[in-house]
């Protein structure tokens, strides 16, 4: 059986002497793994098509065993991102999020499209913290983990909302907050940003001005929310934190 699909390359790893095992996020087939044979050979025509976070059109041979990539055409290499260490690190973080959160064989077309959108903006416009926060929230929404912000998830009250409960996935009112575990306090600005991320287009999100305090609070909240519901730790978050601390301030 033969298959052709547009795909975002999540990662690749050594597989036998001259092959690589490639993990990809396909437009209609979802996440899958396939072998790229002879990819380590200097003249391999597939080499550029299966690099992490590139966008390619791939041809597969599917059988009872492992899927094989037989041909490929590079659609976008995101060269500006690859030439910039910081941007590359963030692009790889997006791929780590996909790899650790997606089940194989489950198509999520909207997430596929938004991933391409974020990679394109990162490549052409440079790094913007809200770009990454947009992707994190978009991932959660597409996986069915949208945070509930407009009412208390325990009693339904819509006013006097006090804290966000990670185990309950939403806000708690003052009365219910006393029995909460894993609660996170969020400012009004941060709550507004979370709501904006969940319902707005990327172009709108990128134009929003955010205070440093709310930016840090938003990043912390989404990090803990992702870790709680995806039950994963994301290694590149630590690397990015180290990078931020080491960068000069002017």
From Swiss-Prot:
GO biological process: one example: DNA recombination
Source species of the chain: Syntrophomonas wolfei subsp. wolfei (strain DSM 2245B / Goettingen)
Name of the protein described by the UniProt record: DNA repair protein RecO
GO cellular component: bacterial nucleoid
Transferase recorded as keyword: no
Homology family: Belongs to the RecO family.
Keywords of this entry: DNA damage, DNA recombination, DNA repair
Keyword DNA damage: yes
Gene that this sequence comes from: recO
Function according to Swiss-Prot or TrEMBL: Involved in DNA repair and RecF pathway recombination.
NCBIfam families named among the record's database cross-references: reco
Coiled coil: none
PANTHER family: DNA REPAIR PROTEIN RECO (PTHR33991:SF1)
């Amino acid at each position: 059986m033969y298959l052709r699909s547009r795909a975002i390359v999540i990662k690749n790893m050594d597989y036998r002497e001259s092959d690589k095992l490639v993990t990809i996020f396909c437009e209609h087939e979802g996440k899958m793994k396939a072998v790229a044979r002879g990819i380590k050979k200097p003249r391999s025509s597939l080499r550029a098509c299966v690099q992490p976070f590139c966008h390619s059109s791939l041809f597969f041979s599917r059988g009872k065993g492992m899927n094989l990539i037989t041909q490929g055409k590079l659609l976008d290499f995101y060269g500006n991102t690859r030439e910039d260490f910081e941007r590359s690190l963030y692009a790889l973080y997006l791929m780590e999020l996909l790899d650790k959160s997606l089940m194989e064989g489950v198509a999520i077309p909207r997430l596929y499209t938004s991933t391409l959108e974020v990679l394109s903006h990162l490549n052409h416009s440079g790094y913007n913290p809200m770009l990454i926060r947009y992707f994190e929230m978009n991932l959660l929404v597409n996986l069915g983990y949208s945070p509930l912000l407009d009412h208390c998830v325990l009693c339904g009250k819509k006013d006097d909302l006090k804290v966000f409960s990670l185990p309950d996935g939403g806000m708690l009112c003052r009365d219910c907050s006393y029995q909460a575990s894993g609660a996170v306090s969020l400012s009004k600005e941060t709550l507004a940003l979370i709501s904006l991320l969940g319902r707005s287009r990327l172009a709108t999100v990128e134009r929003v001005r955010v205070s440093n305090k709310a930016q840090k609070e938003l990043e912390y909240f989404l990090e803990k929310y992702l870790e709680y519901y995806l039950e994963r730790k994301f290694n590149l978050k630590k690397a990015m934190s180290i990078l931020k601390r080491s960068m000069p301030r002017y």
